[in-house]
From Swiss-Prot:
Residues 121-183, 186-244 form the CBS domain. This is UPF0053 protein in cps region. PROSITE patterns: CBS (PS51371). GO terms for cellular component: plasma membrane.
Amino acid sequence: MILCLSFLLMIGFSLIAEGFSFIIPKGYLYAAIGFSVMIEALNQLAQFNRRRFLSANMTLRQRTTEAVMNLLSGQKEKAELDADTASLVADQDQHPLFNPQERLMIERVLNLNQRSVSSIMTSRHDIERINLSAPEEEIRSLVEKNQHTRLVVTGGKDNEDLLGVVHVIDLLQQSLRQEPLDLQALVRQPLVFPEGLPLLSALEQFRQARTHFAFVVDEFGSVEGIVTLSDVMETIAGNLPNEVEEIDARHDIQHHQDGSWTVNGHMPLEDLVQYVPLPLDDKREYHTVAGLLMEYLQHVPQWGRPLRLTVIPCARCRST
């Protein structure tokens, strides 16, 4: 644009000069045009190098996310405005375009495909389960004290094989019909997700299969944990407390008056960075605070050992 205006000005100036019988050597005109072209080329090269430097360590998705979040942040770029234009936009600058909660949810949606199901799953060690051959009294006792809508059914010699899932409502209906509780007849097969499946793909599979429950398996086919549709939705909306007022370990974080934080070891790092600024390595093989500590220490952390994060007591070699 600037180059075109320069050409027009030079051509117009030469025509006006010729109209007043002033003779301007063409060599000066050509030199001015060549100089303008060279300056514009250097300007474009400088802008290209600057953009390449700023985006060298960022993927296209990350750059797009950052651009959208900058747009939604409500922080307008500084620009020189005349008095009339400034008076028109003065009132708009007093209020942000989006409130913080809206910006946070939009950012989570944009990052949805960069998180895998293993980062939000419930570990198999924390799964409420029941043996396929359990007596009816044990089933009733577990249903009475359990507040979940589904129970994972296990079998095998060591009761470690996850066979499927039973809906508590099915057990209730079976009981209302005065029938003996039969887990074998009620077991349903959930979806099976590889541990590296992106959340966006998991959400689509949940929608197509019309089920809200899935096993997460590793490359060897071993079940590492479970994930539900509610888990995926919590990555967008934040923690959704249940009726029994249980504190989900993945959202168990407390801010103290002295500025310190108490964080559950099961909390995903992607959720932690919403509260505590923390650089994350995209190539890391861990997803939780406990994984971060074990990667840093190369052993099970000890209670109260001073680090950048303070670890609370461990149970059975697991950071809690």
